[in-house]
């Protein structure tokens, strides 16, 4: 029997952490971060980690598990998340995956093989390279490759191209989980307002000092490439004013949120909830209760 888990995804600043904590309290659960940047110690403000108080109220996992000089990959995430979920389940609790790194979460849920002749990172990189293509462009690539896909859809096209590219069937190897995937969303202008406000709050909380510490110590590591830090480096180099750097960060975060939504919409089977609608949290909790009781 597959393990039932709750997955909460959505764009940055939409309220994933708050909902995950509420779900954990309601259903005796623990939160597993699905965020590629929250693994780094010392990067707290720019990655929007749950506060110490929130982490004390509900156990959180895969936060602060790497130094900023260390790399972290989808392979690492899947391996560590599997062990974490198994541990949570063994204690009779519910695992709640919450985060915005779609590639990591999708790899976990769909059970992609992490070994074999083709390195997993190469497979993931190829999948990510196909993501920007429109449906028409993907159809053209399929045609060029001499492939036939009855009832074309995006997922089938990407799968067929992947098999053709690597010369082997990389179909899911072992699906361990039965997930309920909840995707939070908001009306676009409201979401962008939330993002702008969050960035302002981050600066008030000390983001500039945190980013400067990263810039001074390790400006070229993987951890420094995340949204929230690299946008401020031109300011530290004297290439932009502070206001220009802050606006650059807001703009980059808005674009990132748009890419996140595109990923969840096209690559994962999610149930969308508009956070601005009345009673939305109650509806989500009811759906989770029905899912767990089924």
UniProtKB/Swiss-Prot annotation:
Query: Could you tell me which residues belong to the region Interaction with substrate tRNA?
Result: 35-38
GO function terms (MF aspect): ATP binding; tRNA dimethylallyltransferase activity
Q: Where is this site: Interaction with substrate tRNA?
A: 101, 127
Q: SUPFAM superfamilies per the record?
A: P-loop containing nucleoside triphosphate hydrolases
Annotated positions binding substrate: 12-17
Ordered alphabetically, the record's keywords are:
ATP-binding, Magnesium, Nucleotide-binding, Transferase, tRNA processing
Q: Which reaction does it catalyse?
A: adenosine(37) in tRNA + dimethylallyl diphosphate = N(6)-dimethylallyladenosine(37) in tRNA + diphosphate
EC number assigned by the record: 2.5.1.75
The coenzyme or cofactor needed here is: Mg(2+)
- The keyword Secreted is assigned to this record: no
Q: What is any one GO biological process for this UniProt entry?
A: tRNA modification
Cited PANTHER family: TRNA DIMETHYLALLYLTRANSFERASE (PTHR11088:SF60)
Write out the similarity annotation: Belongs to the IPP transferase family.
Subunit text: Monomer.
> What is the name attached to this protein's record?
tRNA dimethylallyltransferase
Q: Which organism is it from?
A: Streptococcus pneumoniae (strain ATCC 700669 / Spain 23F-1)
Name of encoding gene: miaA
């Amino acid at each position: 029997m597959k393990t039932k888990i709750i997955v909460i995804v959505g764009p940055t600043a939409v309220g994933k952490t708050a909902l995950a904590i509420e779900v954990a309290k309601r259903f005796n659960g623990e939160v597993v971060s699905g965020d590629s940047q929250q693994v780094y110690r010392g990067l707290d403000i720019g990655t929007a980690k749950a506060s110490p108080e929130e982490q004390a109220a509900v156990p959180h996992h895969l936060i602060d598990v790497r130094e900023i000089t260390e790399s972290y990959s989808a392979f690492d995430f899947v391996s560590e998340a599997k062990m974490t979920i198994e541990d949570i389940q063994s204690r009779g609790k519910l695992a709640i995956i919450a985060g915005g790194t779609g590639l990591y979460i999708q790899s976990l849920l769909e059970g992609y093989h992490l070994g074999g002749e083709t390195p997993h990172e190469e497979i993931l990189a190829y999948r990510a390279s196909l993501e920007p293509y429109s449906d028409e462009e993907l159809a053209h690539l399929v045609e060029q490759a001499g492939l036939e896909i009855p009832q074309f859809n995006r997922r089938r096209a990407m799968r067929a191209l992947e098999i053709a590219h690597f010369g082997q069937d990389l179909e899911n190897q072992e699906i361990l989980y039965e997930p309920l995937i909840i995707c939070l969303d908001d009306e676009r202008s409201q979401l962008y307002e939330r993002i702008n406000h969050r960035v302002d709050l981050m600066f008030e909380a000390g983001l500039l000092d945190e980013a400067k510490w990263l810039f001074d110590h390790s400006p070229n590591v993987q951890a420094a490439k995340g949204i929230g830090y690299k946008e401020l480096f031109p300011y530290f180099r004297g290439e932009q004013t502070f206001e220009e750097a802050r606006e650059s960060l807001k703009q980059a975060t808005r674009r990132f949120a748009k890419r996140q939504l595109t990923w969840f919409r096209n690559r994962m089977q999610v149930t969308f909830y508009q956070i601005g609608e009345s009673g939305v949290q109650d509806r989500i909790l009811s759906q989770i209760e029905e899912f767990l009781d089924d």
